[in-house]
Amino acid sequence: MNFIRTSLYSGVSTAISILVRLISNKIIAVYLGTNGIFLLGQLKDFLRLSNVFSGFGIENGIIKYTSEFQKSEGELRKILSTSFKVHIFFSLIFCILILIFRNTIAEYLLVDFDSTFYFLILSISVISFSIHTLLMSIINGIKKIKLYVTINVVSVVISAILMITLVLKYAIIGALYALIINQIITLLVTLFLFYIYKPFNFNLLFSNFNINYFKKLSGFSIMAITGPTCLIISTFIVRYYLSDKFDTNFAGSWEAMWRISAIYLLFLISTFKFYLIPTFSKLNSENLKKEVFKIWKVVIPIIIVITTGVYLLRDIIITVLLSNEFFLINEIIFLHLLGDIIKINCWVLGNILISKADTKAFVFFQIEWSVIFVILSYFLINAYGFWGVSLAYFITYVIHFSLLNFHLRKLLWIK
């Protein structure tokens, strides 16, 4: 399945997801404001980190090896059974840690209500989403794209309905509960559709633990854990610095800008997730180079058109998607959009490192991005105010893209 065909399949899911996110984001913005967006950003970061650690960060490894060995039941059994046990073990460990340190986590999340019951539900949701992620990684690897799309669409719609309902009834408390309950609902949707479509033999999950595949998958865990951890820590620092330097209106507006980015980048991200790693894993150097340039020919015009449209319609987008409270975004949107153009092309190169299990390089580039972004944000915010955070974002991606190209120069640029 080529990149364009995969894009068309995922486009259906993405279009529905975008529409649903537009509606839910609007309601959240109107009823919760910039402060609510700020608090939800904190929880989303924590959930993202929880989901990575609870699965030991091996999802990309599962995609790679199921793609390579999907026709060899013996090897596939070793991969899937090992992956299943890893997910169960680490999600249970992480849940115990959540319950033990719930008060500290509550302070980080700025949750000021009785949190014991909340963190019990949060623990269950972490286990649920860990299993969901495992199953989705498997069907990603074996390229069951129609089922993948169906699960995403149904989950997004149900999750949005729950989020909107709880926000309207319970405001910020409802939103905080909706985020974690939705992870449980997502697993239930996945299991129901797996029961109907039966994409693979579930007995493959319940075989012996294979130490050799655990070692191979562990290499991917370092990459998967490093990426979100660096992103979450760096955005956490910058978000809090904006809140401290100015107030939560600025921090919430910056978080809202990231949400707008997430919506218009969703189409390309969903295609990348399903297509790049399985495809790159199978290609030799010459064919991989051709594939990268073929993808760039499609991606670059698309992202330029999208970001140009977003910029020209920025006032309408802010009003429709959010509210007048978020017009601070106008100060940062231009350079943020330019940064996104470079960012999407960095992701193509980053997936080469993942598909080839180049752990050291991947970890270096994740740390490099985070360190540069935090340092530049500090100095440029002090020098130029709120606008400085978008300048830091843009410059960071220029440096990041340049370094990635230099690292991959033999593959991409030297004949």
Model-identified regions with their sequence ranges:
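Membrane-interface junctions at transmembrane-helix termini in multi-pass inner-membrane proteins
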Residues: 127-151, 338-368
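Transmembrane helix-bundle signature of multi-pass secondary active exporters and lipid flippases
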Residues: 17, 40, 44-54, 227, ...
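Interfacial segments at transmembrane-helix termini and the short loops linking adjacent helices
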Residues: 102-122, 248-251, 312-341, 387
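Hydrophobic alpha-helical transmembrane segments
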Residues: 116, 120, 150-198, 368-372, ...
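Helix-loop junctions and terminal segments of transmembrane helices
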Residues: 26, 55-71, 141, 200, ...
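Membrane-water interface segments that mark the loop-to-transmembrane alpha-helix transition
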Residues: 5-17, 43, 48, 52-103, ...
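Interhelical loop/hinge segments that connect adjacent transmembrane helices in multipass membrane
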Residues: 1-3, 179, 191-235, 278, ...
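Signature of the first transmembrane helix
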Residues: 2-60, 91, 95-99, 156-160, ...
